[in-house]
């Protein structure tokens, strides 16, 4: 049981709750490719079994979200779960919002929410917040590839954003409000895409089974053909060079740097790095 599982996380559960549920269900190791806050819903990409070794490669991908923010209210957590700190009745025209969103495309610098797991001086930011300790809030650079308004009915505005990994949508909503000279908080958040994976292919927790898992051999389509003399290199996890390779079959552009090698009932995954191919993992008895 080695592959990827796409889960539609419901509101209220932590990402850890979902990982633990799946781990107990399948009795194997489970990892993830990016968490969601408890109040958020949507796509969680889970790595099952040996696929957990690919976590770092799938985490650094673009994310797409559908978010709803409420103007005229500010909370300490920057979302609807927090304590209200400020209210106003400033009305924002739709064209003002549209112009603001256009200006946000590209690289932006966003403050990290004080109620987040981001570590500063060895401690999570939310620990400082809960203890009332003042700390300098770090900023992170994010890339907004696209952002568009889906619906606006004051005080609520729903938008769709495609952004780089690690982008805090709560902070993005705060930045939108600042540029419009008002305040706002996030009231709804749903992840629609994580890299090439789409929420449309995800399963709710009630309908997960072994058949829901996308096997690694079905996910990675590019293939390397080698002679049996190279088998020892594969078993030992050694890198491969072009002279070790008999044939390269390019069947996929989504995971263009990843290749599979099938030999003696074992399945190996390699990643192309320049002129060499780096060993990533092995799955035995996969057929």
UniProtKB/Swiss-Prot annotation:
Taxonomic placement: Bacteria, Bacillati, Bacillota, Bacillota incertae sedis, Caldicellulosiruptorales
Positions annotated as active site in the UniProt record: 37
Organism field: Caldicellulosiruptor saccharolyticus (strain ATCC 43494 / DSM 8903 / Tp8T 6331)
Name of this chain's protein: tRNA pseudouridine synthase B
CDD domains: PseudoU_synth_EcTruB (cd02573)
GO biological process terms held by the UniProt record: mRNA pseudouridine synthesis; tRNA pseudouridine synthesis
Family: Belongs to the pseudouridine synthase TruB family. Type 1 subfamily.
Known function: Responsible for synthesis of pseudouridine from uracil-55 in the psi GC loop of transfer RNAs.
Pfam families: TruB_N (PF01509)
Source species, domain of life: Bacteria
Gene that this polypeptide is encoded by: truB
EC class name: isomerase
EC number: 5.4.99.25
Residues passing through the membrane, by range: none
GO molecular function terms attached to this record: RNA binding; tRNA pseudouridine(55) synthase activity
Keyword tRNA processing in record: yes
Keywords: Isomerase, tRNA processing
Substrates-to-products reaction catalysed: uridine(55) in tRNA = pseudouridine(55) in tRNA
């Amino acid at each position: 049981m080695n592959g990827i599982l796409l889960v539609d996380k419901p509101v209220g559960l932590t990402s850890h709750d979902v990982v633990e549920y799946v781990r107990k269900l399948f009795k194997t190791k489970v990892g993830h490719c990016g968490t969601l806050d408890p109040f958020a819903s949507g796509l969680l990409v889970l790595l099952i079994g040996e696929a957990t070794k690919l976590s770092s490669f799938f985490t650094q991908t673009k994310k797409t979200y559908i978010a709803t923010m409420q103007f005229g209210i500010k909370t300490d957590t920057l979302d609807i779960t927090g304590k209200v700190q400020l209210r106003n009745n400033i009305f924002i025209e739709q064209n003002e919002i549209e112009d603001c969103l256009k200006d946000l495309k590209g690289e932006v610098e966003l403050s990290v929410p004080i109620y987040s797991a981001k570590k500063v001086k060895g401690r999570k930011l939310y620990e400082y917040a809960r203890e009332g300790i003042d700390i300098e809030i770090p900023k992170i650079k994010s890339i907004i590839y696209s952002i568009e308004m889906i619906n606006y009915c004051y005080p609520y505005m729903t938008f769709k954003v495609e952004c780089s990994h690690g982008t805090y949508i709560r902070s993005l909503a705060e930045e939108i409000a600042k540029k419009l000279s008002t305040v706002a908080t996030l009231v709804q958040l749903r992840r629609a895409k994580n890299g090439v994976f789409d929420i449309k292919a995800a399963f709710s927790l009630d309908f997960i089974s072994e058949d829901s898992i996308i096997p690694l051999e079905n996910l990675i389509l590019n293939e390397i053909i080698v002679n049996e003399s190279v088998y020892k290199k594969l078993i030992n996890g050694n890198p491969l060079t072009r002279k070790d390779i008999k044939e390269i079959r390019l069947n996929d552009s989504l995971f263009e740097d990843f290749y599979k090698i099938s030999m003696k009932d074992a399945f190996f995954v390699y990643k192309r790095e320049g002129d060499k191919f780096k060993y990533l993992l092995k799955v035995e008895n996969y057929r």
